[in-house]
Curated annotation (Swiss-Prot):
<feature type="binding site">
    <location>
        <position position="293"/>
    </location>
    <ligand>
        <name>NAD(+)</name>
    </ligand>
</feature>
<comment type="similarity">
    <text>Belongs to the NAD-dependent DNA ligase family. LigA subfamily.</text>
</comment>
<dbReference type="InterPro" id="IPR036420">
    <property type="entry name" value="BRCT_dom_sf"/>
</dbReference>
<feature type="binding site">
    <location>
        <begin position="34"/>
        <end position="38"/>
    </location>
    <ligand>
        <name>NAD(+)</name>
    </ligand>
</feature>
<keyword id="KW-0520">NAD</keyword>
<dbReference type="InterPro" id="IPR001679">
    <property type="entry name" value="DNA_ligase"/>
</dbReference>
<dbReference type="GO" id="GO:0003677">
    <property type="term" value="F:DNA binding"/>
</dbReference>
<dbReference type="InterPro" id="IPR033136">
    <property type="entry name" value="DNA_ligase_CS"/>
</dbReference>
<dbReference type="GO" id="GO:0005829">
    <property type="term" value="C:cytosol"/>
</dbReference>
<keyword id="KW-0234">DNA repair</keyword>
<comment type="function">
    <text>DNA ligase that catalyzes the formation of phosphodiester linkages between 5'-phosphoryl and 3'-hydroxyl groups in double-stranded DNA using NAD as a coenzyme and as the energy source for the reaction. It is essential for DNA replication and repair of damaged DNA.</text>
</comment>
<keyword id="KW-0235">DNA replication</keyword>
<dbReference type="Pfam" id="PF22745">
    <property type="entry name" value="Nlig-Ia"/>
</dbReference>
<dbReference type="InterPro" id="IPR012340">
    <property type="entry name" value="NA-bd_OB-fold"/>
</dbReference>
<keyword id="KW-0464">Manganese</keyword>
<dbReference type="Pfam" id="PF00533">
    <property type="entry name" value="BRCT"/>
</dbReference>
<dbReference type="GO" id="GO:0006260">
    <property type="term" value="P:DNA replication"/>
</dbReference>
Amino acid sequence: MNDQGIKESIETLKEQIRKYDYHYYVLDEPLVPDAEYDRCFKALQQYEEQYPQFLSPDSPTQRVSGTPSDAFMPVAHKQPMLSLSNVFTTDELKAFIKRAIEKLDEPNQQLVFACEPKLDGLAVNMTYEGGILTHAATRGDGAVGENITANIKTIASVPLRLRVSNPPKLIEVRGEVYIPKADFEAYNARARELGEKTFANPRNAAAGSLRQLNPEISASRPLAIYCYGIGACEDYKLPNSHLEQLNLLKEFGFRVSPETRRAVGVEGCLDYYQYMLAKRNQLPFEIDGVVYKIDSISLQQQLGYVSRAPRFACAHKFPATEEMTRLIAVDFQVGRTGAVTPVARLEPVSVGGVTVSNATLHNFDEITRKDIRIGDTVIIRRAGDVIPEVVSVILEKRPANARMIELPKNCPVCGSEVVREADEAIARCVGGLYCKAQLKRMMWHFASRKAMYIEGLGSVLIDQLVDEGIVHHLADLYELDLQTLANLPRMGEKSAKNLLSALEKSKKTTFNRFLYALGIREIGEAGARVLAEHYCDVESLKAATIEELMTLNDIGPVAASHIVHFFAQAHNLEVIDRLLELGIHWPKPEKIQVNQQNPFFGKTVVLTGTLSTMGREEAKAKLLALGAKVSGSVSSKTDYVVAGSEAGSKLIKATELGVAIIEEDEFLKWVNS
């Protein structure tokens, strides 16, 4: 590969990693498993080591991952919070320790390490002055983090005052905030019942819970913390041992991992690694590896730091959470819109600390593409806490009696015909609300927080109401009475009254929420908002044609067809009429006149990078108010790309396609003119 090719490869990796960092640390929405991120990062490091002429100051390898959010006040750390370098193999660990020994003044000594589990949470820095907690911050970019003082105080195990009579004048205590596995599962289960957002994994749950503008939300989440080190410390003599410093933190009142161990040399570290790897599934918290730190503080100081990490410590990462097992059967689940989803039933296997016996097969196109058959030995992956999926088949282990997976002709719940359109990957039950599975999912959607928000109407209660024939349609919910509800198992009069109150409260809504609650195929929150802004009431929407609907932002031919089909069904209109008769109502929105002469009217606009004057959602709202269509990707149909700082691949693609680029200053002039 020539220099130009190498440079392009490096730039591609840098752009990928920046994107991954932004989604992981800022949005708390990881795009790829940790193993894939680590591979990209390591590939970039290797390129830069081999071709140092292409190493640039803006490379992700030259900084600590993470960016302080605009939503929180910045806090500077007195001593930087650097990331750790990663090792993945025994040879890499040996090389790391060898480099450390060679840099020390007495290279022949046997190194002693403090070994700790690497918790998969959010790193924080807590500052105590005169023994009192004065402020707390996230790691951020290593030098400056986000002020989360009010939120960290909601964690009961964080001492507000150090439990010693002679505290340091100032001390920074570093720790990892996490959510225990059991609490995470319980939180997500309840969120699903209430129709609220669930978290992909405990790390995201901890980060999302701690980075809340409202501390009451943080207080409602099951956050915990283990402390792992000390940053700056003034007017206090600290022990010359990391392990002794951890004991000191315990005396101060902090929680320290009980799995911390002392190890000598490479063999001691590897023994600890194997010990924690074997124990990983039994731990009450998620870990993705172990951390080794040279125990002597004076040796740590001799070794110092490289640009983004200490030379005296590293993280030894565990393998990605994939396992082999046998696929023994396939069942089919029916969703709200009739989608029939194949689910693999597996011989139970432990993956990432959870026993997995089911995994999604997504759809029949995926089954065909991966050539998955009943009886196959398959690799399943559980990345974070997303639904486990079948990744691939071990073909050499395929038995002679492996069977093809066939699409059922009839719905496994109601017996109605299952059809699959030629251009769709998804097969559907045509039973509609006659199908109990669809009715249950429809009611769950109708009652969810972003729809009618009927608090207390969760999946367990919905199952009871449908299975016992108490409700047959959405409108039946608003005709429930106290006696019927109170007589249900585990309900009682108080719970029944609360549900009736929630039903009454939900009657006052908005037109866009009501439309979203109806569950029209292809119509999400954004589409419902567009329809509500344009039509204002059911009668005018019922009369809309496909051609007319397609002129609206975010409404394409498929969505338009589903809308017209929905309002052409007599039973849908009957349910809507009943809902309105039973008191569902909304204020009539004021018609906003859009100046059609503004440069954004009718244009497709893409936002990329970071705007210094407003957040992404605010910019999007301004564009929508001006009649623009805001898209998430650049194509030949894009009219403008609004580029903030650190704009990446979208800006590159826009330049390649010749799309007009608008800088922030120009954008502000246009939206404010």
